[in-house]
């Protein structure tokens, strides 16, 4: 991905200055897509003076699903504690370890070799921590065998078409750039608080894997590159904060969807979830989940992970989607909560009438209509 990392000659012994320079230029394609001017001068000015003192360490990734959002967030957090200039390199592509999105989109898979390049007062400590993280599978439990899936019985309920509240986004702003930037920062802060609440909710229910998902979302949203890209759009387009943020996160979502790794590809819905939550705060749109009094099957094109965590499994018996992915965090959360999940049903889903009784067969990924 041109927007993620430049092709560099690090593996063949190139100067570290060249490695860093090329990696910093990896953002040029994204800047052009967003209509921003070239940042060549800016990159040259911000490039640290790397030399032969830089150290590196390569590890082989043993996480079954590679470095997806959760282990990547652990890596970002750990390396952020060291006073050193660092790059991560895989197959000649480099990204900064400050950005969970760049790491995730680097598509580091099982058995891939990942190298950390570091220079600075705590470079050695960073390399040691990197090696320890790899040995610990970046905080994930190594599965020696596939988990035994519990049989999921068919679930039934009345059909309810669900869609999140629509946020109206205006492009033209009547405020100053500084005022729009402050609006965006506040909305991001409110969304980060939302994510902390969701993490605590999952932890209180003993759902540690789900808590880790929303902790990863917190790290994903707190990526300084996202705010920087939106701030530049505000400067050059004189647009609203919601318009700038929508452009940046939609582009990121599309990058995830274009990956050839199905597991990482499914993470686009997480980005869409974060965008939606931030837009709700920016536009001050009121959003409340519907309440149900009888067994219900939710029908939708797709559904956000944060929405599912807030559902009551005692009433919402199943979720049936026209799109979606069985590898998404939404699917994982539904399964953990005991909510039936079938997806990729296509247009036939929309032939169902509201309040019609449905039965979902999770095992066969099919639904049946009463009568």
PLM segments and residue spans:
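Short amphipathic beta-strand starts and helix->beta connectors
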Residues: 94-103
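Short beta-strand/turn micro-motifs at beta-sheet edges
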Residues: 45-47, 102-105
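Glycine-rich, charged/polar anion/phosphate-binding loops
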Residues: 1, 38, 42-47, 70, ...
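ATP-dependent carboxylate/acyl-activation modules
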Residues: 1-58
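A short pocket-lining beta-strand/turn micro-motif at the edge of beta-sheets
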Residues: 2-4, 84, 112
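Non-catalytic, soluble scaffold/interaction modules
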Residues: 56-58, 65, 70, 77-80, ...
């Amino acid at each position: 991905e041109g927007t993620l990392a430049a092709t560099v000659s690090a593996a063949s012994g190139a100067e570290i200055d060249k490695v860093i320079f090329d990696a910093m230029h990896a953002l040029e394609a994204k800047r052009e897509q967003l209509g921003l001017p070239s940042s060549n001068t800016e990159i040259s000015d911000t490039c640290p003076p790397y030399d032969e003192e830089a150290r590196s360490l390569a590890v082989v990734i043993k996480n079954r699903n590679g470095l997806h959002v959760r282990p990547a967030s652990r890596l970002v957090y750990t390396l952020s504690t060291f006073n050193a200039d660092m790059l991560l390199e895989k197959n000649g592509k480099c990204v900064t370890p400050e950005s969970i999105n760049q790491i995730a989109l680097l598509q580091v898979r099982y058995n891939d070799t990942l190298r950390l390049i570091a220079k600075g007062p705590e470079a050695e400590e960073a390399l040691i921590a990197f090696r320890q993280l790899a040995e610990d599978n970046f905080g994930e439990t190594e599965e020696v065998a596939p988990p035994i899936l519990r049989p999921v019985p068919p679930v039934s309920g009345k059909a309810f078409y669900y869609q999140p509240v629509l946020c109206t986004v205006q492009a033209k702003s009547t405020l100053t750039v500084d005022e729009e930037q402050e609006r965006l920062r506040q909305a991001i802060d409110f969304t980060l608080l939302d994510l902390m609440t969701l993490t605590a909710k999952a932890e209180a229910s003993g759902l540690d894997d789900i808590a880790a998902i929303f902790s990863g979302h917190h790290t994903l949203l707190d990526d300084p590159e996202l705010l920087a890209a939106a701030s530049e759009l505000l400067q050059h387009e004189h647009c609203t904060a919601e318009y700038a943020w929508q452009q940046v996160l939609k582009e990121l979502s599309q990058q995830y969807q274009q990956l050839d790794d199905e597991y990482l590809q499914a993470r686009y819905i997480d980005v869409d979830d974060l965008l939606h939550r931030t837009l709700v705060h920016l536009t001050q749109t009121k959003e409340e989940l519907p309440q149900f009094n009888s067994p219900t099957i939710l029908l939708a094109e797709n559904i956000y992970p944060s929405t599912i965590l807030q559902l009551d499994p005692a009433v919402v018996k199943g979720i049936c989607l026209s799109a979606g992915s069985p590898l998404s965090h939404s699917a994982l959360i539904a399964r953990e909560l005991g909510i039936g999940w079938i997806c990729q049903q296509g247009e036939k889903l929309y032939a169902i009438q509201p309040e019609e009784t449905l039965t979902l067969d999770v095992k066969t990924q099919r639904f049946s209509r009463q009568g």
